[in-house]
């Protein structure tokens, strides 16, 4: 079972902690994990130049997205985390998602059937976490992936944290957020196992 975790935060704080917590939790269950953070990475905007459509050989930009493409193809499951910026995902994460067009142009079914899970960290209790989760779920659905939440009563769409604008410390101290993350991870793990016939 191979899981790729992506942190869509330009900082190595709350979202970085939450995604790594998730990967370590799954690693203890026997998963092989890989991690990518947009922090300090060069990821150019999609120009809609259609190079990827015409050439079918990836993106015209040769930057840190190459690592993302490789790991998305490698993974059985994908966990994407984001802090909430202006009520939604970060610009860096949106750019990463937009740039996935390049591998889909080469093979439209390349991500089909992979299991996807979302994590959102907000400085406010109701800062847009669920909107950010839905944006990530839209990415999963558009690319024929299987989005999972943690189920009713607390983790409907995925894992959310209230950091109180205290970065990693705020996430570490959000006991309800950690409970919801584990609940969502357990469902993610179950679906991955079912998909792999384990």
Curated annotation (Swiss-Prot):
GO molecular function per UniProt: 4 iron, 4 sulfur cluster binding; metal ion binding; oxidoreductase activity
Essential cofactor(s): FMN; [4Fe-4S] cluster
Keyword DNA-binding carried by entry: no
UniProt cofactor note: Binds 1 FMN per subunit.
Binding site for [4Fe-4S] cluster: 46, 49, 52, 59
The organism's place on the tree of life at top rank: Archaea
Keyword tags: 4Fe-4S, Flavoprotein, FMN, Iron, Iron-sulfur, Metal-binding
Any Pfam family matching the protein: FMN_red
InterPro entries associated with the record: Flavoprotein-like_sf (IPR029039), FMN_Rdtase-like_dom (IPR005025), ISF_SsuE-like (IPR051796)
Homology family: Belongs to the SsuE family. Isf subfamily.
Function field: Redox-active protein probably involved in electron transport.
Subunit architecture: Homodimer.
Name used for this protein in its record: Iron-sulfur flavoprotein MJ0731
Organism: Methanocaldococcus jannaschii (strain ATCC 43067 / DSM 2661 / JAL-1 / JCM 10045 / NBRC 100440)
């Amino acid at each position: 079972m191979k899981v790729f975790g992506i942190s869509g935060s330009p900082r190595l704080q709350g979202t970085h902690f939450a995604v790594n917590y998730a990967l370590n939790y799954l690693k203890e269950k026997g998963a092989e994990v890989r991690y990518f953070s947009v922090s300090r990475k060069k990821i150019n905007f999609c120009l809609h130049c259609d190079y990827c459509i015409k050439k079918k050989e990836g993106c015209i930009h040769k930057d840190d997205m190459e690592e993302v493409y490789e790991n998305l193809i490698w993974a059985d499951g994908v966990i994407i985390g984001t802090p909430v910026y202006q009520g939604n995902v970060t610009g860096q994460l949106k750019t990463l998602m937009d740039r996935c067009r390049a591998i889909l142009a080469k093979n439209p079914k390349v991500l089909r059937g992979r299991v996807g899970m979302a994590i959102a960290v907000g400085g406010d209790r109701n800062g847009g976490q669920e909107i950010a989760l839905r944006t990530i779920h839209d990415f999963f659905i558009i690319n024929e992936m299987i989005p999972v939440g943690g189920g009713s009563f607390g983790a409907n769409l995925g894992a959310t944290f209230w950091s109180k604008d205290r970065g990693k410390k705020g996430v570490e101290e959000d006991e309800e957020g950690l409970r919801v993350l584990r609940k969502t991870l357990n469902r993610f793990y179950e679906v991955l196992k079912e998909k792999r016939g384990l």
